[in-house]
Each structure stands twice: as structure tokens, then as C-alpha cells.
């Protein structure tokens, strides 16, 4: 009975539950039917892309949308306030003579995105601050007021994605149009000034890519490009279309400790403003640029054993390179492993082929460091694009671009500079061995740049010119103590100098020293940043007593004659004379050595380059006039910070340059010029430039004689200039063509300076200082010196320059001499030339009255 009652209860409950389930199911079905009948609400995000042809690139980073020639970023809100880097590079061009593929924006932009009201704003972090220690809340508040982050650009918010995890905004103005934020077009091309005017209406977006840490936007931009030489327009504006790749990359929150710069080291750097502690003054701090190399086995490294780095520097080699190029490229890159082995790193650098099976590999992804092959008409030397975290100086990635016509460049250099000595290069093309040797040389130097090293143009000046003609010396020491010098081949070696090395040997002692300073590992758990700095500073103190281990900063090239690009040896006059002998041999044999060149195109390019090289030699020697040697050394080293070039060498250099200019056309091969298609002889053109160069040297002499009154003075400069240029007047004879051109240049400059000084009350020498200022007074830097500072002392040119007085005195003497000369029996052309000079002098004197 009891069992029956229990069963009855269960039956009742079961029925009730069943009824409830049926009712719920019915309601749910009704709700489903209702939801199906009601359309889903369309969001702003949906409408933004609805019925539009959209190209989308997705990744963990930023999703990029391209539609209607516009670019939209879909930025995860988790990336707001995360620092990023904006850069640009040239990827193609319609005019390789003006624009070089691989050229990059000079200053990548550090920024972050933030939301302000209804806009996304692009802010630049005030990353000049570097806090060495924990600061107080009050100091932090004061810093926040005085070092705010600036807003560079704003973008209207178009929508949020459907789960509101990302914001969508239009970045076409930033990444789809030419922008002043990151200008990629050149402003100089050799001696020519370049002006590029963007044509926004002719801008087109070619493609987009998105990776885990960066995005790429590829564009075609059209510019109106014009050239000028010394402010004189050369031709009209010409349309030039360039491929421009913009990249936005996430800056990693690197844990690498910065290395405090020493200005005596030739390494690139990032600048910060140090805030040491409350109550102390700010100070400028510089971090060297370097890869984060940490030994895999720290204990073995500490014992002096060769150790693999935990993360070696890996470069991916483009598989489109000609097969014969790949080995010299590898050798050029891996040459630097010799320097890393000296400081305990084994296989610090690797070169591997483009992966065939790694699905996520893309050479356009800037997190991969690649060596790219660029099919281009440009015969430029390789260039590199380096991405640095400015917060620490860590090099995150670097890529090299090698142009398909680099063989032409190497052939030109090798034939012109060594053809007089080396019969094996006297042909239309270099042999495979000579080309491989040259390619390795170029790659080695550019790899140095990708490791953070700067050019060291003064290195070769530490070798005597005579030593460069010595077989034993050049075999052992090479052509310079650094591959970072601008030395191609040994152009001073003569045909009688048997066994002399003609090409660089590889890394020099300076390169080993610089890699040691920049990449020596310090265990951050045991060595503080200050102890590291002090150890390295003492290391440099000891090494730079040897001039061959010094860094000669390019920023001082305006004054220091050792820093003239292309110079070889310590005696510029001797080197120039030897080089000119070799160039004459090559020039006279071009028709014999270069075959199968019916249109003379190859020979004309070589002939033009020889004339340009001769002009470069002239400028190298002229750099002694008004020059000073600038030495970045501690006072305790007892080496003067600046030392004016001796009076004897300045005067000898000026007289050499005057004679060279007046007789420069003797080098011209008129028979060759008549056979070809040369519209104007470069030798004729160069003479005009030489006149301006000679006149400009007076300003440098004004400064150096002010600094050292016992050196070559402006009066002595003008006396030598006058007595040499107007010797034909004193001898009452017709001037040579060279004399006539230089006399006109002198008269033009004299008229400008004297008339300006008397007619307008100003100084013909200009105003202000001709020196770079010493920099902000921000206190002492943690490392030795300031790597951004020009070493030349500051001098107000108006105190030193007396050009108008000396020009005026010269004109007085010249007027008397011309009046006497015109009484002689002169050819009509000479008489007309002298009469015109006398007329101009009298006009100037009228102003004086």
C-alpha cells in the first residue's frame, strides 16, 4: 500500500514536469519565430563596408581596409597608447637618376594613438625624458605639465566594430597621400638641389598588408620634380611617379638596457633628456644603436669562451639574386663575425635564404631583416633601412637593398681608379672575381651601418700617401683602418708600384674596436649602467691615443680637411698629383680599352666620371685652405680640440688649386669629345664651379686666422689670389681661357661684396656665426662628450671677415694695372675682356663715392 501511494505521487510529479517542459518549448519556439521574423539591426560598422568593394588585411595587430582609394584602420582598443613607429621608403621610381629605390624617410616618427572626444588622435610621446631613478609624485606632476605629449594629427571615428573592441578611422591623409611628417623624396642629388612638389590628385593606393607587429601600405605618388644648381634652375619641372611604402610598426617594450654613448665612438644614437633626481639639473643622454646580443651561456662567456648569442642577428637573403652574387654577399655580411668573435660571440650574424616552407614569412614584413635584390636602372651603392627603438637604442630590424646595376658602379670605380695599374680591369666589364671582390666590399660597409656604425671618413687620413704605394704596408694594413671610410680603390698607386694592394682588405683595427665597445656584453644583474659606462669610457681613453682608432665625425667636415669624402692618404696634394697621372692614362686609353661601344655611351660615362674625380681632387686640396683639425679628446689626452692647418700648407694648397683651376682644361680630350655626343664638356663646366669654390674659401680663412693670428691670414690669401689670377694683366698679355673665367669670377664676387658693404650698409661676409653653436646648456652628459655637437669653436663672422676691404684694395690695384695693360698691343678678345673689367671697377668705385 505504501508502495502504491509512492508510485502515485511520482506519476503526478512526472506529469507536471512534462507539462512544464512542453510549455517552455512552446514559448522558446515562439520566441525563435519572433526573432527570425525581426531583421537584425544594422550597425555603423556594417554600413561602412556594405555593398562596397573592400580589400582587407587582418592580423593580431591592426586590421587594414582599403576601399574607394581610402585606407581605414581597425585599431584594437588594447593598442591605444601603445608606442608605434611610422616610416616610409621608396620602392620604385620612373626616374632612377633622381630618386633611388630603397631610400627611406630621414626621421621615422614615434607616436601612439589615443581617443579624445569623438576623434582618434595621433600623439608624439615626449620621450626625451629618461628617468634614472624613481622620482617623487610632485616631480612627476611637474614633468607632466612641462613635457606633455603633442598632438600631430586627428582622425574622425567612423565606427566601432560590432563588439566595440576596435575603433575604425580613416588614415588616408596619413598613409595614402604624400605627407610632410615623413618625406621620402630627396632634397639633394650630388651637387644638385631637388624640389619635389606632390600632386595629391595623382596619388593611388596599390596594396595593403598586415602582420602581427606592423602594417604596410603601398602607394604610387606623383611629384613635380625640378633641379637647380647653385640656385639656378636646370630644366623645367618633370612629372615623376614613385612607389612609396609606409609602415606602422609596434615598438616592442624592450627589456634591453641602453648603452650610454661616448662621443668618441662612431656609432649612431638616440637622444634623451635625463631626470636624475629631485633638485638636480637635467642632462642630455645618448643611447647607442645596437642589436640586443646576449650570450646563450653566460657562465661560459664570463670565462672567456666563445658563446652563441641567444638570439643571433639573422638576415634573409633574397632568392632572386643572380646565383654568382649570393656568395660575395654572404661573405660581406659575415665578415663582421670576425669582430664579434674577438669579444666572445660565435656566429653572431647569420645569413639564410628566403624560407620556402615558412608560411608566415614575407620580406615586406619589417620584423624580418632582409637583403633585397632591386631590379633598377640605378647604379648606386647598397642602401639600408634600419628600425630602432628610440627608448633603448635597440635595433629591431634592418634591411639592405642591392641594385641590379651595381656592377656598372663597381666597373666605373675599378677601371678609373686602378686601370692605369691593373690590366685585368681594362675592358667593358669586370671579371667575375673582380666583381665579387667589389660586391663583398660594398656589402661589408653597408652591414656596418646596419650594426649601428657611422661613416668614419677621416680614417684613411691616418695612412701616409707614400705608405699606400708600399706593397708590404697595403697587404698588411689595407687602404684604411676602417671599412666605414669612403675608400673604394687605391688610386694613388702607380704603374711602377709592384705588388701594391688595390682593393680594401676587409675589417680594420677601428672596426674591431668599435664593435668591442658597442657589443661587449655586461651582465645587467651584476654590473650597473654607470659601472658599464665607466668601464667602457676607460677602455676608450686607452685606445684613442692611437689616431687610427679615432672616430672622425662627419658633422665636422665643413672645417676638417681629413673628412673630405673620397680622400686617400694624409698628403692631399701628393695624392691628387698621383691620381691625376693615373686618370690621364685611363682617359687617353678609353677608346682602346672599351670595345663594342659604337654609340660611345660607356666611354662617355667613364670620361665624365674622370672629370668629376679630378674636380673632387681639387676640392680635397682646397679644404686645407681655412681648414682646422678637430679632435674629440679629453683634456688629459693633451690633444688640442682644434688646430688650424699650418700657414705653409694652406698657402701651398691655395697656389696648387689656383694653378689647377687655370689649367684645368688641359685634361680635356677634345678629340674624344668631338667623336661623342657630349653637349658641353664637364671640364668647361667645372671651371665655373672652381671659381666659386676659390672665392668662398676666403670666409674659412677669415675664421681660422681669427682663431690663430699666426696662421694664413685673409690679407695673405687675397695677395696670393690677386697675384696669381691677374698675372696676365701685370705681364700685359692675353689671358688664357682658364685665367679669363677665374678673373670674371673674382670680379663678380668683388662687385657683390663691395657694393653690398657700401651701398646697403651690410657686410659682404654675411651675418651671424659660421660655426655650429655649442648646444643647449643642459649640464654634463653621462657619457663622455656630446655626439651631436660640432667641435668647431663659435665665432661671429662679422668680427673676423674683412673681405670688402681686401676686395676693394685689389680693385684699386687692378684698375691701375688694367689702365697700363690696355696700352699694350692685345688681341681683340683680350682687350674687350680687360675693358669690361675696367668698366665694372669704375662702376663699383662710383658706388664707393
Stretches found by the model and what they are:
Residues 80, 324-348:
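Zn2+-dependent metallopeptidase catalytic core
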Residues 14-24:
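Bacterial N-terminal signal peptides
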Residues 2-15:
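Bacterial N-terminal signal peptides that target proteins for export
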Residues 33-321, 339, 343, 354-407, ...:
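Auxiliary tRNA-acceptor-end handling modules of aminoacyl-tRNA synthetases
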Residues 28-30:
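Boundary at the C-terminal end of the N-terminal hydrophobic targeting segment
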Residues 334-345, 444, 448-449, 489, ...:
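Sec-exported extracytoplasmic/periplasmic mature domains
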Residues 459-849:
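Conserved catalytic/binding loops enriched for acidic/polar residues
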Residues 353-374, 437-494:
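The catalytic-center signature of Zn2+-dependent metalloproteases
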Amino acid at each position: 500500500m505504501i508502495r502504491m501511494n509512492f508510485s502515485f505521487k511520482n506519476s503526478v510529479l512526472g506529469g507536471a514536469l512534462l507539462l512544464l517542459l512542453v510549455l517552455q518549448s512552446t514559448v522558446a519556439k515562439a520566441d525563435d519565430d519572433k526573432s527570425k521574423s525581426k531583421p537584425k539591426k544594422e550597425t555603423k560598422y556594417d554600413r561602412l563596408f556594405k555593398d562596397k568593394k573592400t580589400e582587407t588585411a587582418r592580423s593580431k595587430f591592426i586590421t587594414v581596409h582599403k576601399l574607394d582609394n581610402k585606407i581605414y584602420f581597425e585599431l584594437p582598443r588594447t593598442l591605444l597608447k601603445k608606442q608605434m613607429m611610422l616610416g616610409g621608403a621608396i620602392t620604385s621610381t620612373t626616374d632612377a637618376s633622381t630618386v633611388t629605390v630603397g631610400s627611406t624617410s630621414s626621421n621615422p616618427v614615434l607616436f601612439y594613438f589615443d581617443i579624445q572626444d569623438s576623434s582618434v588622435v595621433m600623439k608624439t610621446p615626449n620621450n626625451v625624458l629618461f628617468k634614472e631613478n624613481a622620482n617623487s609624485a610632485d616631480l612627476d606632476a611637474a614633468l607632466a605639465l612641462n613635457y606633455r605629449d603633442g598632438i600631430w594629427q586627428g582622425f574622425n571615428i567612423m565606427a566601432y566594430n560590432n563588439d566595440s573592441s576596435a575603433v575604425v578611422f580613416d588614415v588616408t591623409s596619413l598613409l595614402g597621400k604624400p605627407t610632410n611628417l615623413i618625406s621620402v623624396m630627396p632634397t639633394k642629388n650630388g651637387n644638385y638641389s631637388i624640389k619635389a612638389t606632390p600632386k595629391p590628385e595623382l596619388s593611388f593606393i596599390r596594396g595593403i598588408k598586415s602582420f602581427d607587429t606592423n602594417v604596410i601600405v603601398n602607394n604610387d605618388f606623383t611629384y613635380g620634380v625640378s633641379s637647380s644648381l647653385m640656385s639656378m634652375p636646370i630644366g623645367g619641372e618633370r612629372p615623376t611617379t614613385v612607389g612609396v611604402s609606409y609602415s606602422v610598426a609596434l615598438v616592442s617594450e624592450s627589456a634591453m638596457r641602453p648603452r650610454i654613448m661616448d662621443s668618441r665612438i662612431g656609432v649612431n644614437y638616440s637622444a634623451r633628456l635625463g631626470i636624475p633626481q629631485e633638485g638636480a639639473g637635467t642632462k642630455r643622454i645618448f643611447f647607442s644603436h645596437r642589436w640586443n646580443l646576449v650570450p646563450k651561456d653566460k657562465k661560459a662567456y664570463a670565462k672567456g669562451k666563445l658563446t652563441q648569442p641567444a638570439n643571433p642577428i639573422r638576415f634573409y637573403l633574397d632568392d632572386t639574386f643572380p646565383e654568382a652574387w649570393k656568395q660575395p654577399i654572404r661573405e660581406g655580411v659575415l665578415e663582421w663575425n670576425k669582430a664579434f668573435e674577438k669579444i666572445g660571440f660565435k656566429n653572431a650574424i647569420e645569413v639564410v635564404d628566403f624560407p620556402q616552407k615558412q608560411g608566415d614569412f614575407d620580406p615586406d614584413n619589417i620584423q624580418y631583416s632582409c637583403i633585397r635584390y632591386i631590379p633598377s636602372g640605378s647604379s648606386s651603392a647598397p642602401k639600408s633601412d634600419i628600425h630602432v627603438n628610440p627608448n633603448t637604442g635597440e635595433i629591431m630590424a634592418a634591411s639592405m637593398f642591392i641594385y641590379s646595376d651595381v656592377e656598372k658602379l663597381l666597373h666605373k670605380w675599378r677601371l678609373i681608379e686602378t686601370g692605369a695599374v691593373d690590366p685585368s680591369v681594362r675592358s667593358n666589364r669586370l671579371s667575375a672575381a673582380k666583381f665579387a671582390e667589389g660586391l663583398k666590399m660594398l656589402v661589408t660597409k653597408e652591414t656596418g651601418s646596419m650594426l649601428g656604425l657611422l661613416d668614419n671618413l677621416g680614417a684613411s687620413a691616418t695612412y701616409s700617401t707614400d705608405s699606400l704605394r708600399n706593397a708590404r704596408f697595403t697587404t698588411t694594413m689595407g687602404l684604411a683602418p676602417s671599412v666605414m671610410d669612403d675608400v673604394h680603390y687605391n688610386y694613388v698607386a702607380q704603374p711602377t708600384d709592384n705588388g701594391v694592394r688595390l682593393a680594401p682588405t676587409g675589417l680594420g683595427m677601428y672596426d674591431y674596436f668599435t664593435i668591442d665597445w658597442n657589443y661587449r656584453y655586461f651582465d645587467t644583474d651584476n654590473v650597473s649602467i654607470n659601472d658599464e659606462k665607466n668601464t667602457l669610457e676607460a677602455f676608450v681613453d686607452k685606445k684613442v691615443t692611437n689616431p687610427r682608432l679615432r672616430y672622425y665625425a662627419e658633422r665636422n667636415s665643413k672645417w676638417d680637411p681629413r673628412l673630405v669624402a673620397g680622400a686617400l692618404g694624409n698628403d692631399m696634394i701628393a695624392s691628387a698629383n698621383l691620381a691625376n697621372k693615373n686618370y690621364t692614362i685611363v682617359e687617353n686609353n678609353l677608346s682602346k680599352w672599351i670595345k663594342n661601344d659604337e654609340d660611345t655611351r660607356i666611354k662617355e660615362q667613364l670620361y665624365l666620371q674622370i672629370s668629376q674625380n679630378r674636380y673632387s681632387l681639387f676640392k680635397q686640396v682646397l679644404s686645407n685652405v681655412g681648414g682646422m683639425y678637430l679632435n674629440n679628446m679629453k683634456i688629459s689626452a693633451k690633444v688640442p680640440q682644434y688646430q688650424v692647418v699650418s700657414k705653409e700648407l694652406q698657402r701651398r694648397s691655395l697656389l696648387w688649386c689656383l694653378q689647377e683651376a687655370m689649367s684645368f682644361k688641359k685634361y680635356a680630350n677634345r678629340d674624344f669629345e668631338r667623336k661623342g655626343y657630349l653637349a658641353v664638356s664637364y671640364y668647361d663646366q667645372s671651371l665655373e664651379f672652381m671659381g666659386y669654390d676659390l672665392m668662398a674659401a676666403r670666409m674659412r680663412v677669415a675664421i681660422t686666422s681669427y682663431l690663430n693670428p699666426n696662421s694664413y691670414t685673409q690679407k695673405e690669401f687675397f695677395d696670393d689670389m690677386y697675384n696669381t689670377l691677374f698675372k696676365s694683366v701685370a705681364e700685359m698679355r692675353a689671358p688664357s681661357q682658364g685665367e679669363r673665367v677665374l678673373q670674371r669670377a673674382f670680379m663678380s664676387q668683388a662687385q657683390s661684396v663691395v657694393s653690398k658693404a657700401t651701398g646697403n650698409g651690410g657686410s659682404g661676409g654675411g651675418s651671424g656665426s659660421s660655426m655650429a653653436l655649442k648646444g643647449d646648456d643642459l649640464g654634463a652628459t653621462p657619457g663622455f662628450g656630446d655626439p651631436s655637437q660640432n667641435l668647431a669653436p663659435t665665432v661671429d663672422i662679422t668680427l673676423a671677415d674683412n673681405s670688402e676691404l681686401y676686395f676693394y684694395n685689389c680693385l684699386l690695384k687692378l684698375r691701375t694695372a688694367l689702365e697700363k695693360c690696355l696700352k699694350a698691343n692685345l688681341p681683340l678678345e683680350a682687350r674687350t675682356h680687360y675693358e669690361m673689367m675696367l668698366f665694372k671697377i669704375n662702376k663699383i668705385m662710383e658706388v664707393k663715392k
